[in-house]
Amino acid sequence: MLVLGIESTAHTFGVGIAKDQPPYILANERDAFVPKEGGMKPGDLLKHHAEASGTILRRALEKANISINDINYIAVALGPGIGPALRVGATLARALSLKYNKKLVPVNHSIGHIEIGYLTTEAKDPLILYLSGGNTIITTFYKGRFRIFGETLDIALGNMMDVFVREVNLAPPYIINGKHAIDICSEKGSKLLKLPYVVKGQDMSFSGLLTAALRLVGKEKLEDICYSIREIAFDMLLEATERALALTSKKELMIVGGVAASVSLRKKLEELGKEWDVQIKIVPPEFAGDNGAMIAYAGMLAASKGVFIDVDKSYIRPRWRVDEVDIPWRN
């Protein structure tokens, strides 16, 4: 079985191709939209994805050394994500499905991140940290679905860091030589400033932390503010994670999503793993950010259990939660 996967939920337009036997991933091509200034405007995202889609599709097929006729199914991320961006991927997937008579496989973007984590880390029964620009979720698989033990109550951890560095003119670009701008800034800081620390049960709140940090700009060294906001945010995440580990007694902790690439977070998680005697399994950088390979791979798993959707019912779902998705391939 060969599945072509399309990812377009946010800043990245990606196309991946997955096979139902090793090495599983045959292609993983993408292009990310980076605004010249400010945040991402939905209209700019749509324009970028529409212009990049043809080139990325062709590159993926060339990388896998196959033609579109060799593909069995078309998988597409229908949510969660930004509406105009989602529509580009959905429109391309529907067009390919109709023109080449291929069944369409609906994929939840979050499930894509989680399943590529299972594949690349070889985790068996982990507690999962899903950390990206739009999501901060602590979850694990139980009775047919991924159940949420904790999540952000407002903005996501990755989004909080992006907004801070943008507001203090450290970004865009947000990632420089593999490092987030807040990590680069934090390396020159050492003073831990007093900022809000909000953990409620296993849920976290980052909006007050962001506001308080921005109010310190001009009053404290920017490097110390960067250091403080990052350290406090990561400590909040670790406290919530420790509570979930205590509740679930899991012996593996799998980290997926773009924030998983943070070197400083990795060090904290490794220390947590030693303290709790838990194996830390972090998705490789190539598959940490948004990518088409994870959609193709999750689509392949879904297709193996007959999960398809009619083209005329393939609506985008910008607020599609991970705990709303049935996972028949793990039962």
Curated annotation (Swiss-Prot):
Belongs to the KAE1 / TsaD family. It is an enzyme of class 2 (transferase). Its cofactor is Fe(2+). The keyword Cytoplasm applies. The gene is kae1. One of its GO terms (molecular function) is N(6)-L-threonylcarbamoyladenine synthase activity. This is tRNA N6-adenosine threonylcarbamoyltransferase. It catalyses: L-threonylcarbamoyladenylate + adenosine(37) in tRNA = N(6)-L-threonylcarbamoyladenosine(37) in tRNA + AMP + H(+). Fe cation binds at H109, H113, Y130, D290. HAMAP family: Kae1. Binds 1 Fe(2+) ion per subunit.
